[in-house]
Amino acid sequence: MFDIQKETIEWAGRPLTIETGRVARQADGAVMVSYGETTVLATAVGVKQAKPGVDFFPLTVNYQEKYFAAGKIPGGFFKREGRPTDKETLTSRLIDRPIRPLFVKGFKNEVQVMLTVLSHDLENDPDIVGMIGASAALVLSGLPFMGPIGAARVGYKDGEYVINPPCDEMDDSELDLVVAGTQDAVMMVESEAKELSEEVMLGAVMAGHKAFQPVIDMIIKLAERAAKEPWDYAPADHSAEEAKVRDLIGDDLAAAYTIVDKTERYKAVGAAKDKAVEALLQTEERPDGIDMTTLKDVMKAVESSIVRGGIIKTGKRIDGRSLDQVRSIVSEAGILPRTHGSALFTRGETQALVVATLGTGEDEQFIDALTGTYKERFMLHYNFPPYSVGETSFRLAPGRREIGHGKLAWRAVKAVLPTKEDFPYTIRLVSEITESNGSSSMATVCGASLSMMDAGVPITRPVSGIAMGLIKDPEGIAVLSDILGDEDHLGDMDFKVAGTTEGVTSLQMDIKIAGIDEEIMKTALAQASGGRLHILEEMGKALGEARTELGEFAPRIETITIPTDKIRDVIGSGGKVIREIVETTGAKVDVNDDGVIKVSSSDGASIKAALDWIHGLTAEPEEGQIYKGKVVKVMDFGAFVNFFGPKDGLVHVSQLKAERVNHPSDVVKEGQEVYVKLLGFDDRGKVRLSMKIIDQETGEEIKKEQEDAE
C-alpha cells in the first residue's frame, strides 16, 4: 500500500529524517520531517490553472502547532486550536520568505504549503524542521520551484557558533539567528542579538549556510527517487510587448522617476501607465495576446528596468540621493501630554508615532505555547493604517505583515531593556505609522527607543535601525541605504539592520532573486553601520539618554520582601485582606510566592498607605520601642491594647500609672488611644507593655519612671 522513501542524516548531534509515501499521499508533495523527537508534516499543493486576472503569485504558507504535539489540551471554552498565534504567524512568514523567490518568474497558480507540528520534544524548535519540510515537499511536488533550500539556527556562546542549539540553551546565547538558502547563496536571515559586531553576525550567517548543506544534499537524494514529474510550465515571452511599452511611455516613466515628492511621482507614473492602457487596450488595433493582466506585468518590467538602470548608471536614486545617503530626519520626544512616554520619528516621507505605557505585573501578557505557559513583560505592537499611504481599507485588524514588523522591532530593542529586578514594570510600546514611504519598521525601532527614554525606562543605549536595498544587474551592483518604498518594490533585497553604538541587535534579510553571496552582505553591513550611527546622532538631538524620572502619569512601583509565612496575613482568607488594602488605598498590590510584594500607583500617598498597612501586618514589634495604640478591652488585672497592626498586648495594672491604681477602668476606657512601650515577652511569648513610663501627652519616655519600672 505504501511506497515509503526515507533519508536520514546525523545533523548537529541529532538524527534528521525526511520520509515520504506514508502520509498525505493525495497532496502534490508531502513529507514527514523529524529532528530528534520533533516531527512536522509538510504538504504542498498547487492549482493546475491560474485564475484569470491574477497579477501576483498567490502563495500561502500556513504553519500550525497542534497542542497534542506536546501532550497538552488547549485552553478556553471550546478546547481546540483557534486563530493562529503570533508564533504561528511569524513562523509562516519565516518559511514563506526564502521559498517565494525560487518559484519560476511569472508563475501565478495558487500554491498552498501547510506545516503541521505533530510532535514536539521541547528541545528542537519546529520552525527549522518546518522550513526543511516545506523545501522537501515543494521539490517532490513537481511545481516549478527552483529549490531545494536548507535552513539552520545559529547561536553564539563563549565566542563560538552553535548550530541548532536546544531550546533550553537559547537563554544563554548572545545570538538567535535563522538562515535559509540554496547550495550557492543565502536567501533569508532573521535574528536578534546582544549587541554583536558586524563581523560576528556575518560569520554566523556563513556558518549557518555551511551547516545546512548536508540537508540540501539529502533532499536532492530523496527527490531522485520520489519526486513527481515536473509541471509543464514555461514563462511567457513578453519581450515584444515590453519593447512597445518602452517606446510608448519609457521617456514618461523616466521623467516621472525624477520627481522627488512621492505623491506627485505616483501621479506622473499613473498618467504614463494610463497612456499605455489607452494606446494598447482601448483601440481597434489591440495587439494579439495582450490583456490587462499581461500589460500590468509588462509595465512593471519596463518600470523596473528604467529605475534600476538609472541607479546603476548614474549612482543617483529616485529622490536624488547618493547610494549611501540617509533621508532627512526629525526626532521629537514627549509630544503627547498624558501618555507615559511618546516620540515622533520622521525620516523623509516615513513617520512613526510611538507611545510607551508602563504597567505592573498584572499587565503582563500570558502566552500559552507548546513549551508551556509563560508571561511576557515587554510588548511592541505595530499598526499600519491605510491613511499612511493615502489609501482606504476595511481591514483594520493587524495582519501578518504588521505582526511581523512588530516582532522585528521588538527584537531590535529587547537587548537594551533593563532587567526586571532593576525595573519591575511591564512595558508596552505601540507604533502608529502615520506616513510611509519605505522602512517603517526601522522608523518604529528609532521611535521605540525615544519613547522609552521619554518614559524614563533606563535602557542601556538607544537603538536605531536602517533598511538597505540592492540592485543587482549585469551592468553592475548598487547597495542602497535607507530605501524608499519604490526601491524596495523594484529592487532585489530588503536588508534591515538595527543596533546601538556597540553592535547589532537585530538583522533581517529578504532576497527577491536567487540569493546573494558573502561579499554583498559584507558591503551592506558596513554601509548600514555608517547609516545607523548617523541616525543615532540625529536621534540624540531630541533625547540622548533616558529621563531620570518617570512620566508624571506613569505608575510608581515600590518593592518589599516579607517572610513567606507572612503571605497569608497579607492576602487573608479568600483574599479579604488584600482586597481591603487595594480598595482603601487605591494602590495595586502584587504578591509573589517568594514573598516579594510590589505596590504600585501613580499617587505616592497611596503607595505609602499600602506599604504601611502591609508593614503593620507582617512586621514584628521591636522590644524597647514606643507605639501608639488603642485600648480594646479592660479587665480587672489590666488593659489589652492593640498597638501593632493586628497585635494586642497586655498593660498590667501595675504598669498603667506610677501611682497605685484600684481598678484599670479608673485610668483607661475601651477605644481610648494611648502610648505604650514594649517591655518584652513573658515565658509564654505574651507581650508585656507599659504606659506609666510614657508621657501620655507627648509620647516621650519618662526616664525616672523607666528606672523604677525596671
Swiss-Prot record:
Residues 624-692 form the S1 motif domain. It holds the Pfam family KH_1. It is an enzyme of class 2 (transferase). It comes from the Bacteria. Keywords: Cytoplasm, Magnesium, Metal-binding, Nucleotidyltransferase, RNA-binding, Transferase. Mg(2+) binds at D488, D494. Residues 555-614 form the KH domain. One of its GO terms (biological process) is RNA processing. It is found in: Cytoplasm. Its EC number is 2.7.7.8. One of its GO terms (molecular function) is 3'-5'-RNA exonuclease activity. One of its GO terms (cellular component) is cytosol. It catalyses: RNA(n+1) + phosphate = RNA(n) + a ribonucleoside 5'-diphosphate. Its cofactor is Mg(2+). InterPro entries: ExoRNase_PH_dom1, ExoRNase_PH_dom2, ExoRNase_PH_dom2_sf, KH_dom, KH_dom_type_1, KH_dom_type_1_sf, NA-bd_OB-fold, PNPase. NCBIfam families: polynuc_phos, PRK11824.1. Involved in mRNA degradation. Catalyzes the phosphorolysis of single-stranded polyribonucleotides processively in the 3'- to 5'-direction. Belongs to the polyribonucleotide nucleotidyltransferase family. This is Polyribonucleotide nucleotidyltransferase.
